[in-house]
Design a protein with these regions (language model features):
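Pseudouridine synthases involved in rRNA/tRNA modification
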Residues: 1-6, 177-178, 198-275
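A generic structural signal for residues embedded in beta-strands
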Residues: 33-35, 195, 259
Length: 275
């Protein structure tokens, strides 16, 4: 019964009246179930063992399908490779690229999720940010949901009564020709949009960020893919969010795993600037 309700909640059950959403409702006439058909594009794991795999997700790919009209997500790959018991353990935003952990079965999924909940997984990212970052520093600012009614629902904000959030920032390389710095960001907590919001808060916005540093109309235009590449670059600094998940470090079943990206993220960042 729970499975049937989940299908209704996702809008995958239709009758002659349309999509069946209401709980305990009686469907009329013929019943249609929308099943999820995998259409893989050939992505392969950069690391795998019996319990899990790690993929290098490209920017622009959803970690998880977001509705009936989703044409492609990482699940097209993982379900075609490992079956429908496989699932992503944590999510990366659509425009964030990099390493993402995939459990091959429910037992592994629950165990790996517990590692994230207990902050036993160390993560590091690379980001291309505006301005010159000259020294290492730590951003310790609490994060909460935005209370502004005219703002995008997913937008977060720095607020005194928010959840504790700490990010370490390390400058790697400065590019004087476009006044931007490649930094390594290490989140010590796991808040939504933590790295993006923290860097925006200290005046080092991640280039290409469609949400922080833009207004609602611009964000929606980017989300709906209504802007040209040049327009996107002019408004946000890059044609994509220049944020890449580079490393996962954790212990699982008595073994220590240190998994690094294999993508040339620096070249991809620079290409997205349109230079």
């Amino acid at each position: 019964m729970k499975g049937a309700q989940r299908l209704c909640d996702k809008g995958r059950v239709l009758d002659s009246s349309g999509v069946v959403l209401a709980k305990n409702s009686v469907a009329n006439g013929e019943i249609f179930l929308i099943d999820y058909k995998c259409e893989p594009k050939g992505a392969r794991a950069i690391f795998e063992c019996e319990e899990f795999a790690v993929f290098d997700k490209p920017s622009g790919v959803l970690s998880h399908p977001n509705g009936r009209h989703c044409k492609y997500s990482l699940y097209d790959e993982i379900w075609s490779l490992y079956g429908r018991s496989a699932a992503v353990v944590h999510r990366l935003d659509k425009e964030t690229s990099g390493v993402i952990l995939v459990a091959k079965n429910l037992a592994s999924l629950n165990a790996l999720k517990m590692l994230f909940e207990n902050r036993a997984v160390k993560k590091s990212y690379f980001a291309l940010v505006s301005g010159r970052v000259e020294r290492d520093f730590v951003i310790d600012e609490p994060i909460g949901e935005s209370l502004e009614t005219d703002e995008v629902a997913i937008k977060m904000r720095i607020c005194e009564n928010g959840k504790k959030a700490i990010t370490e920032i390390y400058p790697i390389e400065y590019f004087s020709e476009f006044n931007a710095t490649l930094v390594r960001a290490v989140p010590l907590t796991g808040r939504q949009h933590q790295i993006r919001l923290h860097l925006f808060h200290v005046k080092h916005k991640i280039l290409g960020d469609p949400l922080y540093g833009t207004d609602t109309a611009t964000f929606e235009a980017i989300l709906d893919e209504k802007l040209s590449v040049c327009e996107r670059i002019n408004l946000t600094g890059a044609s994509r969010l220049c944020l890449h998940a580079a490393n996962l470090h954790f212990e699982f079943n008595g073994k220590i795993y240190d998994i690094n990206t294999k993508s040339d993220f620096k070249a991809e960042f620079l290409k997205s600037l349109g230079i």
